[in-house]
C-alpha cells in the first residue's frame, strides 16, 4: 500500500523508537539512575545530563543531590594535596636533606644574632603561627621594605624565589635578607664570625662542611665587610684578598644551604578541601556536607570553572600555583619607586654570584635547566609581572599581593572583578563576571585551603611553632 505524504514511514519510525525506549527501561522500576537531568541553573538553561558527553554528566549523590561531572572530579583531584609530588631534589645544595644541616638551619632561622641590631631573625618575618608570614602589608626588619612577606609552606617545590624570581634556589634566597639593609642588615663577614665564635655552631658547621675561615676571629680582621650594605662594609670587603673573599663566600653560602635545608621541611598539610577531595576520590558522599557547606561547594565549582572564572589558568596543581609570573594590574606605571617585577628579576638572577651556574653551587651545569633556559629580559609581559603565590593557608597569610595592598581576600576578588584603570595596556586580567553572592562563595571556598594547624585554637595554643 502506498504511503500518503510519507505518513506510513513516519508511523513506522515512531513504533521503532517506542520499542527501543521500552527495551531501555530498567528491570527494577525504583532503581536509582546512574545520571540524572540537571536543573537549568546547573549547566545551562534547558540542558540535561543525557544531552552531554559522559565526561560532562553529573552523577547523583544519595537523595538525588547533584554532584560532579567526571571532568570536574579530575580537576578537584588535581588540586588535592594527595597529588603533591615527592620533595624535589636541589642539585645545587648537596646537604639539602641532611638531618644535621636541617637542625643547623633551624637554629639559625630562629636566632636574632644574625641581624645588625641582634633583634631580628628569619622568624621575625616568617612566623610559624602565620604559615611563615608576618601579618603585615609590607615586611619590616631593620627598616621598612617595599614588599609583602611570602609564606614558606611548600617553598621547596618552587623554581624561582622572591616576588620577582631574582633567586633560583632556596639557599640563594636565604642569604639575601641577611645582607639586605632594610631586613637584617648584617654583612657576610659578621655572619661567618657569628658561626665561628659560637662553639655549638662551629662544631655543627665543621661536621658538615669542614674548617671555617677562622681568620675572621682575628682582632685585626675587618669586623663588618661585605659587597652590599653601607659604604664601610663595601670598602672593607674590597680590601680583602681574593682568596679570603672566596672562603668567606663559601661559608656564607653554606649558611644559606643550611637554612634552606630546614625550610625544605615546611611541607603543606591537608585542609578541609583536601579531606573533601579525598572523600570524592573514594566515591563517598555521606560526609561531604560535614566537610564543605553549600556555599563552599558553590565556590569550589566556580573556582574550577575554566570558562567563568579561569582561576585554574594560574592557580592550579596541589599548591594552587603555576609557579609563573603574571601582571595582574597591581603596578602603577610612572609612579615614584615603581616596582618593575619579573623583568628586573631576570636581570638580577643572572648577576647573582650564588645562582645555579655559579662557583658556589653544587650543581653540574646540565642540572641548571631553569636558569639556562630562562627567557631573556626585555619581554613585554614581564614588566610589572610578579610570581603567582600559592593559595594554601590564605586565611592567615594576608594582606595580599606583592605589596600587601589588599587587606582581605574579598578585596582581592573585587579587584579581579573590577581591575583599577592602571597599566591597562599590560595587565592580563579579564574582569570576573560574578555576582556579589558568587564572589562571597568563591572567597568561602578559598578559606577551606587553610590547614587545621593554623586555625584560631591551634595558633592560640602555640601548636605551630616549627621545631620549637
Show the residue positions of the predicted features:
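N-terminal secretory signal peptides that target proteins for export/translocation
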Residues: 1-7
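Sec-dependent signal peptide recognition
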Residues: 8-16
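C-terminal motif of bacterial Sec signal peptides marking the signal peptidase cleavage site
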Residues: 20-22
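Bacterial signal peptide processing site
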Residues: 24-26
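Short glycine/threonine-rich turn/loop motifs
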Residues: 33-181, 271-406, 411-414, 421-422, ...
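Extended surface/linker regions that mediate inter-domain or inter-protein docking
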Residues: 62-67, 194-327, 332-333, 364, ...
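Axial heme c-ligation environment in periplasmic c-type cytochrome domains
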Residues: 88-92, 152, 158-209, 241-248, ...
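C-terminal capping alpha-helices of c-type cytochrome domains
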Residues: 188-215, 249-270, 362-377, 384-389, ...
Amino acid at each position: 500500500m502506498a504511503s500518503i505524504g510519507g505518513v506510513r514511514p513516519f508511523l513506522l519510525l515512531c513504533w521503532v523508537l517506542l520499542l527501543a525506549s521500552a527495551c531501555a527501561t530498567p528491570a527494577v522500576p525504583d532503581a536509582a539512575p546512574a545520571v540524572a537531568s540537571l536543573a537549568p541553573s546547573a549547566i545551562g538553561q534547558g540542558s540535561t545530563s543525557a544531552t552531554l558527553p559522559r565526561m560532562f554528566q553529573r552523577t547523583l549523590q544519595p537523595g538525588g543531590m547533584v554532584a560532579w561531572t567526571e571532568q570536574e572530579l579530575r580537576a578537584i583531584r588535581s588540586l588535592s594535596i594527595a597529588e603533591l609530588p615527592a620533595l624535589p631534589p636541589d642539585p645545587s645544595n648537596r646537604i639539602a636533606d641532611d638531618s644535621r644541616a636541617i637542625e643547623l638551619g633551624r637554629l639559625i632561622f630562629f636566632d636574632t644574632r644574625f641581624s645588625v641590631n641582634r633583634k631580628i631573625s628569619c622568624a621575625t618575618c616568617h612566623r610559624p603561627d602565620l604559615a611563615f608570614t608576618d601579618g603585615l602589608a609590607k615586611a619590616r626588619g631593620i627598616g621598612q621594605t617595599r614588599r609583602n612577606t611570602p609564606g614558606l609552606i611548600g617553598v621547596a617545590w618552587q623554581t624561582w624565589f622572591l616576588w620577582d624570581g631574582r633567586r633560583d634556589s632556596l639557599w640563594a634566597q636565604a642569604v639575601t635578607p641577611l645582607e639586605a639593609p632594610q631586613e637584617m642588615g648584617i654583612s657576610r663577614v659578621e655572619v661567618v664570625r657569628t658561626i665561628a665564635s659560637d662553639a655549638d655552631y662551629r662544631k655543627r658547621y665543621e661536621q658538615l662542611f669542614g674548617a671555617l675561615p677562622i681568620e675572621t676571629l682575628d682582632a685585626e680582621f675587618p669586623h663588618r665587610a661585605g659587597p652590599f650594605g653601607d659604604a664601610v662594609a663595601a670598602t672593607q670587603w674590597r680590601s680583602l684578598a681574593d682568596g679570603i673573599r672566596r672562603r668567606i663566600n663559601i661559608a656564607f653560602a653554606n649558611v644559606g644551604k643550611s637554612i634552606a635545608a630546614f625550610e625544605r621541611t615546611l611541607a603543606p598539610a591537608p585542609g578541609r578541601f583536601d579531606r573533601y577531595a579525598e572523600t570524592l576520590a573514594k566515591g563517598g558522599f555521606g560526609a561531604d556536607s560535614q566537610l564543605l557547606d553549600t556555599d563552599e561547594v558553590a565556590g569550589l565549582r566556580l573556582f574550577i570553572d575554566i570558562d567563568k572564572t579561569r582561576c585554574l589558568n594560574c592557580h592550579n596543581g596541589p599548591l594552587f600555583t603555576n609557579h609563573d609570573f603574571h601582571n595582574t594590574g597591581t603596578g602603577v606605571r610612572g609612579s615614584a619607586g615603581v616596582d618593575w617585577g619579573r623583568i628586573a628579576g631576570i636581570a638580577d638572577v643572572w648577576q647573582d654570584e650564588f645562582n645555579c651556574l655559579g662557583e658556589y653551587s653544587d650543581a653540574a651545569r646540565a642540572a641548571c635547566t631553569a636558569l639556562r633556559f630562562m627567557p631573556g629580559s626585555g619581554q613585554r609581559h614581564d614588566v610589572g609581572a610578579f610570581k603567582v603565590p600559592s593559595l594554601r593557608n590564605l586565611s592567615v597569610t594576608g594582606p595580599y599581593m606583592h605589596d600587601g595592598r589588599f587587606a582581605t581576600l574579598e578585596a582581592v576578588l573585587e579587584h579581579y572583578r573590577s581591575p583599577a584603570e592602571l597599566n591597562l595596556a599590560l595587565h592580563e586580567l579579564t574582569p570576573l563576571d560574578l555576582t556579589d553572592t558568587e564572589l562571597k562563595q568563591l572567597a568561602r571556598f578559598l578559606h577551606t585551603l587553610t590547614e587545621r594547624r593554623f586555625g584560631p585554637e591551634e595558633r592560640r595554643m602555640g601548636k605551630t611553632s616549627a621545631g620549637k
